Amino acid sequence: MTAKKTTLKNIKKIGVLGAGQMGKGIAQVAAQTGFETVMVEPYDEVRKKAREGIIKSLDRSVDLGKIKKKEHDQILDRMTFAKDIESLDDVDFVIEAAVESTAVKEDIFKSLDRICASHVILTTNTSSVRLGKLASVTSRPEKVVGMHFMYPAQKMKLLEIIRTPATSDESYNIVKDLSIKMGKQPITVTDSPCFITSRLIQTFINEAIFCLYQGVSSKEEIDTAMKLGMNHPMGPLELADFIGLDVVLSMQQALYNGFQEPKYRPCPLLLSLVEVGHLGRKTGKGFYDYNADGSKKD
């Protein structure tokens, strides 16, 4: 019997693993594109919040006239929210969007390789984990591809497609075509530390932290310089707080460890803030202090 092949045409059901900020946005994009979508999240509260967040996002689209109420309901009808990874045993394509940890993602890819049919392409939304490490724990390295969506996934057009030397042209082309079908503008990146977007933004953030650390200027003026001088919507220190300083440190360490070049060494000030639990908006304190609703304190 001839083994089933994955083509864009026969992808009907997409599995999204992880219901955090990225996962819920990716699942919404998949369902809005017309795919039956299974979102897997083991934590009940996170799964519940993800569903509520998607409904709120769709409600907003209706209010703005971007979609009709009928479309809103059809999108939700295409979505299933599951607790167990075994629920992905009949999907045609997988996008993993779990926590940014090599060990966690390796365990997930081992499970996906066991659960999913052999023709299924396994993708990851990682922003910093080396794709080759994930491909190496599967029996299908040629079908492991990176799909790095930008935040928020339902709004941002760019998508980084990451391929390893083992990634087949067939798998790459399917992911590229799927990205375009989802309304994204894909760019192709090799399996290099932090790829393009994370590499550039983390270098930018780290240099801003060094400016603060070395007394070049105040945090407010560093951020103002980039907002008013370069037309950035957020200053680099505000952006770091928004991302989460623990996540920022993790990505910068991935860059430094990947290249072993001094220019990527994380600033000691960032390490100090993370060590004492000042992680940005999510903890109420980072470079700035925040209210419970995430707004910056005066």
Label each region the model flagged:
Residues 2-59:
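NAD(P)+-binding Rossmann beta1-loop-alpha1 motif at the extreme N-terminus of oxidoreductases
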Residues 2-8, 35, 170-173, 180-191, ...:
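NAD(P)-dependent Rossmann-like dehydrogenase/reductase catalytic/cofactor-binding core
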Residues 32-35, 152-162, 233-234, 253:
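Acidic/polar active-site rim loop that often engages polyanionic ligands
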Residues 39-72, 161-171, 186, 193-201:
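Rossmann-like dinucleotide-binding cores of NAD(P)H-dependent redox enzymes
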Residues 45, 49, 60-121, 129:
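Rossmann-like NAD(P)-binding element
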Residues 121-190, 198-199:
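Rossmann-fold dinucleotide-binding core
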